A protein has these predicted regions:
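Anionic, Ser/Thr-rich low-complexity intrinsically disordered regions
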Residues: 1-180
């Protein structure tokens, strides 16, 4: 397996930096030669946007039972796609990141961490009435920042800090990721 260094952003066996991950969340089109983890992360944001929209449709006033059932089926489909994308990230990690025996084991796979960050990215943007990516799924009303929006952004910042610490610990062989 290849040696990884935190902050490298190419597809040569290194984990993407937190800034590259956040840029991928915002972008809808991958740059040429984009890292496979970033492409999956970009798609996870889109899944979370679609999921949020489906829930809004199902919870709309006077939503018919057919509409609610359709939204439920759509959420199931989206969740299967999220699982596939998380698995793609985890397979890439297993194939490309050196795992040092004896290093502390992290409790989540990298795919699960990135999926959680993508979900919080979408929630934080929607709390401000902003689209989560450059390709919004629907128009959002402008909103005034409130305590809920602040909480989402603080939590996203905490997740970003945790991701940065995790990839640094992996690169320095202090932590290893579970391989499923």
């Amino acid at each position: 397996m290849a040696t990884a260094y935190a902050g490298d952003n190419d597809a040569t066996g290194a984990l993407p930096s937190v800034s590259a991950l956040l840029r991928a969340f915002r972008s809808t089109t991958p740059p040429p030669g984009d890292h496979p983890v970033l492409e999956a992360a970009r798609q996870l944001v889109h899944c979370h946007e679609l999921r949020r929209h489906a829930y809004r449709e199902a919870q709309a006033p006077k939503a018919s039972s057919a509409r609610v059932a359709g939204a439920s089926r759509l959420v199931d489909h989206i969740d299967r796609e999220r699982t596939r994308l998380v698995d793609c990230i985890d397979v890439w990690v297993a194939d490309n990141i050196a795992h040092r025996e004896g290093a502390s084991l992290h409790t989540e796979t990298l795919g699960a961490v990135i999926d959680r960050m993508a979900g919080k990215w979408v929630a934080a943007h929607h709390a401000l009435g902003l689209p989560a990516s450059n390709h919004p799924t629907d128009e959002l009303p402008a909103s005034t920042p409130d305590g809920e929006a602040h909480l989402h952004w603080v939590r996203l910042a905490e997740l970003a800090d945790g991701y940065k610490d995790l990839i640094t610990d992996i690169a320095e062989h202090r932590r290893r990721l579970p391989v499923f």
